[in-house]
């Protein structure tokens, strides 16, 4: 397989006992990573493993306690910025048809329902109400995750120190591959938010952002079935990057009269 690729498609890091060759595979059905290491006779051996990139077919989005009553306590990030990030993530999951599990706690006595802007982005998805701070210890909520049949989780929620970190640690212990969408999570203080992220990362979670999730799922701007939707999300929520895309569309390639 490697011999069939052009040199420009392969990059390696020399000088190490074991190096990884990243292979451009935009035209292939699955992404692969070739790991090259010397064998006992001095010759290189090539092992093929999957790249750790998410696809629309292998991950589930968990939206945990995205409720106004809990957002009031967030001090790790500007609340409006956080809300915009979560909405962008929710729109992305909807566009790429990911299973979405929303869960709430104390919705009728304090926290309120899923925030309206987020609910609008996920359509008719109904939140699973629970009492336990750890979603993984709630039978109904955990069953909803298991029922998707997917072992890769994207997690966004409030608060990072508890209702995000507890189920993440539990899911990792059960063998799930968990990515924390860190800019779509909020904590009580910048320090406690950061410490919670560090604890989850130490346990094996991967840190990511909503824009990386979108770009990782899209990957190729010639994927026309999601191009317009992905571009619309970027233009609405990705700051200067979105402004640049809008400019390119309107000025460099203006619509024909």
Task: Give a label for each model feature.
Residues 152-210:
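A contiguous pocket-lining binding segment that forms or flanks enzyme active sites
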Residues 127-146:
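Glycine-rich oxoanion-binding loops at beta->alpha junctions
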Residues 6-19, 26, 35-39:
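Low-acidity, Ser/Thr- and Arg-rich intrinsically disordered low-complexity segments
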Residues 36-132, 194-201, 206, 218-257:
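Active-site acidic carboxylates
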Residues 87, 139, 161-165:
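Glycine-rich phosphate-binding loop at the start of an alpha helix
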Residues 94-101, 123-126, 147-153, 176-181:
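Short, surface-exposed connector motifs at secondary-structure boundaries
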Residues 111-118, 141-142, 167-169:
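Distinct, well-ordered alpha-helical segments
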